[in-house]
Amino acid sequence: MSDSFNLPLRPLTEKRERPDPLPVEIAQINAQYGSFRDVTEDSLRAKIEADKNKDPWFDKEENDNASADEDTTERLDQLYKRRAAITQFALQAHMEAMFALDFVSLLLSKHTPRQAEMSMSAYLKQVAPLGSLNSEIVNPPPKPESAARDTKNVSRGWRLQNFNSAASKLLDSATRLEAEVASETRYWDEVLAVKEKGWKVSRLPRERQALGVQYGFLEATPIFRDRGLAALRRTNDGSLILDKGLIPLKARTVRVRVRSRGQITGCSKNQPASDNTESIESRILQARDTVYEEELFHELVREARILGSQGVTTRQNLVQFPVSEEQEVLLDLIDSDQISPENDVVSSNEHAVVADALAHAIRILLAYAHRQNLRRRTQLPTPLTPKRRQTPEYQLLRPVMAYLQHSSHVRWLESLLNDINQILKSAGITCDFTATPFSSLSLRRTISGLPKVEALVQEFLLPYESTFSAQLVTPQSSFRVKVRTNVTTPPLGTHYEISVNMPQYPDVRPPNRIGLQDEAASILTHFVLLDILTAITHAKGSSVKGIKQETGHLLTWQAAYPHNGELLALSSTGQHKKMKVSLSRHELTVRVYSIRGIDGFGKPAVDKTPAMRSQTWKCDGTPDQPNLMDFIAEVSKE
């Protein structure tokens, strides 16, 4: 390749062969200042100073002041005079134009009389015949050499000036083109970098000459799907800017808080901001996250409107639903840098993990809803009907509410059974309680045709079930409790299904479905109480859970009113006794009374004296406290 070389665009300027002639300069001085006798150095300096200090607006101001002093009448007369002058000038110009037209027409009538006659005036046709005027070419007199040289110099000057102008324009265009090339190169490099990172770049639907990046989710609702496309604009230096359109400038996020007993005890963590917030990648990610968070809160509000019967409330920018009597969850859409007011300050981080888990759960459920939309869209469409198909609300709040409510009921039931078990242990009775929380969940279950992620999420959309079982004091006595929570299909809420196996009371059957915790607690404690009464009636001469009882001179207890916890012991000496047994989650109490006999209604007549003996067992039993069977053996003596 040949070496590069510089090609100058501007013409080379040459010095004049000789200066301007002196007679020309003298003529210019005489025309400007007059005779040389009147031109002195002082007069020239005074003229220069006067030109420097002269105000260019002075004459205009004088004219304005003079015109302002004229009255209205003079201005009106002046207006009419100027109008007449303008009209006269127009008529004179028209007349001169007609004279010129007649002259040219008469001159052309020598050669083309028919065409020239059409442009002649009527007066000229009368006074001058056609072809009476002719023209000849006369050679001009030869110009002197000085005039030809001056014309040549002027032409050369004009050419030099035009060359300089063209060179300046070419250099400016080259500079502008170089800057434009650098700007375009930087723009396309950044566009290519955006595409290489996995973002979809395409033309805008309504602006075909511009490029856009698709950062939204195609399976979102139409209002948020259309907002997921932003234009990639180019600045003057070629860098990319993201035209977000309706997307807010600040990042927004859905905040989850847990309120317990009126205090905020947990708050979800905001997503940490990127280190390089000015990069196009961080701006695209911020726009994507903001659209996703706004769609998430929009769907939460839509779902909350149909869950009003389950305690879900919405007000302004807040969604609130209860978990238990003392705990509730708050969800709101805030700016990432928003500062919480004083009444919403987090008092502790007791439930911070729960808040973070809920925040992740609702986002995963929204992504699962997007996948379900894609699955429905790829399947065969349903037949067309005149009725418009409604878009169902996404299941975002309902699975979360079901999990929290079910977990709350499971913890309550575990606490109840543990308390009863501790009371029985303090009374010397051993029972086996077994708990299987969330027994319905099978994380290893696979569904044909579904990815593992969707199959895993689908497990949490089904009703939750937990199973509790217990082997009671007497052999073959047991109960089983199934806790079931469902917030998607009826029956809604949490229900307890209790099944009992008590051979001593075969007719005792619990209700099919129990919805209140107090009712479930009373039924379970009642069944345990019946089993304790059965153990007391079989205590003489037998062993209960490995405990040997004394057999000499002991009364035999019989269940008089077992559902009221009353036992009766009849003695041959007439010293009858009555036992009252009561059980709650806090204590087990046994009271023994002496009775005179049986009244006419078959009921024992209790003495009005206080109880002979009384014993209470609690969760934190004392070491010197006798167990239940020892106490029964002692009060059974005649």
UniProtKB/Swiss-Prot annotation:
One MF annotation (Gene Ontology) recorded for this entry: transcription coregulator activity
Disulfide cross-links: none
Biological process per Gene Ontology, one example term: regulation of transcription by RNA polymerase II
Compartments reported by the entry: Nucleus
A single Gene Ontology CC term: mediator complex
Family of this protein: Belongs to the Mediator complex subunit 17 family.
The protein, known as: Mediator of RNA polymerase II transcription subunit 17
